[in-house]
Amino acid sequence: MTVRPLPLAGAALRFAMSPSLHTAMRRIVLGAVLVAGAVMPQAAVAQGADGALQISWEVRNRFRLFREERDFLIHTETLRAGSILASEDALAVRSDGRGWARNTVGRLCIDPTGRISEPCTRDGVKESYLTPTEHPVTVRLAGAIPVGATCAWTFDDGDGPRQSTVDCAEPINFRARYGRPTTATVDVSSADAPQRVTTQIEVRDIFIAGLGDSIASGEGNPDKPVALSDDGFCFQSYLGGPANQYFRPGRANFKGARACEGGDTSGSGLRTWQLLGAQWLNPACHRSLYSYQTRAAIALASQYQHIAVTYLPLACTGATITEGLFGSQRARECLFTRNAVTCTGTVEAQLSQLRDALAAARRRQPSRQLDLVLLSVGANDIDFSGLVADVIVDGATERGLFRRTGVLGSLDDSRATLQRELPQRFARLREALKPLVGGDLAHVVYTSYGNPALTGGVPCPGGPAGFDIHPSFNADPGRLQRVAAYVQREFLPRLKDLALCDGGVLCRDPSSDRMTFVDQHQQAFADHGFCARSSSDPEFDKQCFSATGESFTSDIVAASSTPLTCGRGASEFRAYAPRARWIRDANDSYFAAMTYPQGVSSSALPADIHDATWGVLSAVYGGAIHPTAEGHAAMADAALPAMTNVLGLGGAEPSTIIREQLPLAPVRP
């Protein structure tokens, strides 16, 4: 079948399309052609730098979670400058610190409940997300192309050749069959001798799953941060009474009572309040596109033109190996929309979700394999959040209450779990993961944590700075130093032993039981803990987040209208502006997410949105002591080389190109 060239710069071919798919392709091909020249990486153009004609090709929109190519192109563009961290900073500046994901999150092949769209309409074409049968590809001739040359293209995937003749300066867009090679041949006709160039096009679709806890999920980095109001919102204290109330910035556009007195306790006020919250890729798990796992998968797709990445994010904030990976766990938030509330209260075990997805994929494509698992887990197992609470909760009333309810952790209990229980849990996890990755745990890339409490390589000094969002918070210097030392000297080294079967950790078959371990980012994190400050930090941070813990107006009359002592509005805070700290402090957690966790029975949480419990939870449940988007980007930079090595991608992608000088056509007398 011959396909006519488009009237603009490009042409499209279709292979074995249904009439409806053909119609959809015709709708998108114009836009695809217009951007084809822009998306070609510099390496592709450089292939013909020596003057020899070559066929250059790349998969379009090859991070398949994205429905629309424009969301992928912003990453390919900014990643050309170098690292994922540099890309994140560039995107942050471009968005004025509001974040690149705030628009992308609504254009994905997985919805906020975690349901995979099958099929998923990507750039106007319906595709199976888990089991693609074809991929969109752009092909062009590179090198010293003769002026005015005409290219006769032929594509053959075994079902007969498809042909199109266009100007050689124009790209060709077509959908390549998955699982079989397509032979691409171009005959170049010009005033010079005719030439023929041939290559094979075969897309490698890489299936990656992301597993783990809040570090893996991207906690602390909502895809669309909460919009805060510039006036104050009242919280009660556990001591009660007007004298113990305090004001902090509220949620923008909230029409209810801002004072503690007269608040709506019916429950409807809470629902209205929740509609104004931050938005996440998955609210139940505080799953975010800023997660290092997602950023590394995007970068992998950007770096290699001949692959596509099918990515399944399953990590969940609060997950342990026992509750989260093997068993169900409590959800962090419900999904609130204007028409409904989705709130099951629990999240299905990640390993169960992964097995189900693989089983569904193999029913359609029996040869479909899981190529890579990205994993970070273990911090919740040793109750790291309890250790953090023990460091920052300073008020006597709150400490007494939280000690009785088990919120405050202890180093002794954490150390006992690290030494006795965590090795057993890792052994069980290895046995569960091994059959999912073909029997070789090298395909599990375990990325360790950065120490969150260091600056200049030493523990942060402590104090209220970064934590004065709640009156009872104050990072105790002694407890902070002990926890930082425990993390650095005991927890992180033990995780490495567990992943690599070292340090006395017994594995059944060390040669196949060792995970691929990543910790190269830890040195950089030693200069970017939660207390790191720089003259280049955002002006809002420098003016409004006090180094002495005096960020908020203490007089409740004045605070009701001007809660910040700096006099600026909370709406000026930019969650994704570049800053020295790569770890969210409690102030960041509140200003970025202001989370009211709802993943439990409504009877277990107060209906009054001014209640003292919400005051504490909203300060920490949005990601206090978790990496920022920059921190996640640094982790992704560390993980990416390990991923490419395991996948055998290495450096430049191999390409077999055959060139022939064709005989000149005989001249007729």
Regions found by a protein language model. Give the residues of each.
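Low-complexity, serine/threonine/proline-enriched polar segments
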Residues: 76-101, 105, 235-303, 413-424, ...
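Conserved SGNH/GDSL esterase-like catalytic core that processes O-acyl groups on lipids
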Residues: 232-420
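Beta-strand-enriched, solvent-exposed domains that form extended recognition/catalytic surfaces
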Residues: 47-207
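Mobile gating loops/cap/lid regions near enzyme active sites that modulate substrate access
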Residues: 451-625
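Sec/Tat signal peptide C-region and signal peptidase I cleavage site
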Residues: 40-46
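Structural recognition of the beta-strand scaffold that forms the well-ordered cores
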Residues: 207-211, 215-219, 310-315, 371-376, ...
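A structural motif corresponding to the C-terminal end of an alpha-helix
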Residues: 292-310, 366, 418-444, 479, ...
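N-terminal secretory signal peptides that target proteins for export/translocation
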Residues: 1-24
